Amino acid sequence: MQDLIKRTLPQDDALNQAIVNDLRSQNWAGFLNYSQVQQLCHNFELTTLKLAMHLLPLAASYSHTAISHFNVGAIAIGEQGDFYFGANQEFANSAIQQTIHAEQSAISHAWLRNERRISDMVVNYTPCGHCRQFMNELHGAEKISIHLPHSQNNPLHSYLPDAFGPKDLDIAAHLLAEENHDLVADHQDDLVNQAILAANQSHCPYSNSPHGIAILFKNSDVVTGRYAENAAFNPSLPALQTALNFAYLNDKKLSDIERIVMAEKALKLSHKTMAETLLSTLTSVELEYYSL
């Protein structure tokens, strides 16, 4: 990842050097906090939006695009000004529906860092209909601005007029808002407990079937994922995808996975088979499943 980032940001430029130094200090995690953003903007006389635009090729470098070879980068800006990178993640030898779109990637990245509201989405290509619908699930969706290289300051709803969303199904819950499904993490195995805690933070008001993922890496790091459901159903993002996406954006290698646990309360649907199918194309590590 380090070499790819340096190729993406030529190091004969002072701004790029400063960005690389920030990323190196955090082990190449695709994230810049508010203080880092403000320091870069101050030192190089940039607006927040101009910095985000400059970072789009860097965000896109976190992509895995074995199918399309078309890298999309996105940056979700949180309400306090943090930058969350996102990139499209494709999975060869599996169903195309397993794909993570760049905007989904950035939003789920923000969610797993406990962001509560996205104010802006900066992306290098016009959002597809799938992503427009996914963003419409967000807390504060009516206030989100979309910024493209050729067109800035566009309200999300200008891309999705007469939108269908949670309110049409009489649902008050929104993605990124605090969630609690009263799941108790009291297992003797800590990794199982982390999967349960992730499931407890799922956004699943349509099926009421939360599930979470916990991945243990060989260096003892743990990455978790939560289920993000959508009013339109198909743009929903399973917990395995949010976990894998977070791993990719934090420069984790899937070859270093030691264990993978899923905890699920399968009331109306289950993601167990879908997760096992995807994992079989990525690793020899088998899914450990716990029904709640």
Curated annotation (Swiss-Prot):
Entry keyword set: Hydrolase, Metal-binding, Zinc
Cofactor details (free text): Binds 1 zinc ion.
Residues of the active site: 103
Organism whose genome encodes this protein: Haemophilus influenzae (strain ATCC 51907 / DSM 11121 / KW20 / Rd)
GO biological process: cytidine deamination
Enzyme class of the recorded protein, top EC level: hydrolase
Chain ranges of the CMP/dCMP-type deaminase domain: 47-167, 186-292
Reactions mediated catalytically: cytidine + H2O + H(+) = uridine + NH4(+); 2'-deoxycytidine + H2O + H(+) = 2'-deoxyuridine + NH4(+)
Amino-acid positions noted as binding substrate in the UniProt annotation, renumbered to this chain: 88-90
Entry-linked CDD domains: cytidine_deaminase
Cofactor(s) required for function per UniProt: Zn(2+)
Function noted in UniProt: This enzyme scavenges exogenous and endogenous cytidine and 2'-deoxycytidine for UMP synthesis.
Protein name: Cytidine deaminase
Enzyme Commission numbers on file: 3.5.4.5
HAMAP family xref list: Cyt_deam
Subunit structure, as described in the record: Homodimer.
Family the entry assigns: Belongs to the cytidine and deoxycytidylate deaminase family.
A Pfam family assignment: dCMP_cyt_deam_2
Example GO molecular function: identical protein binding
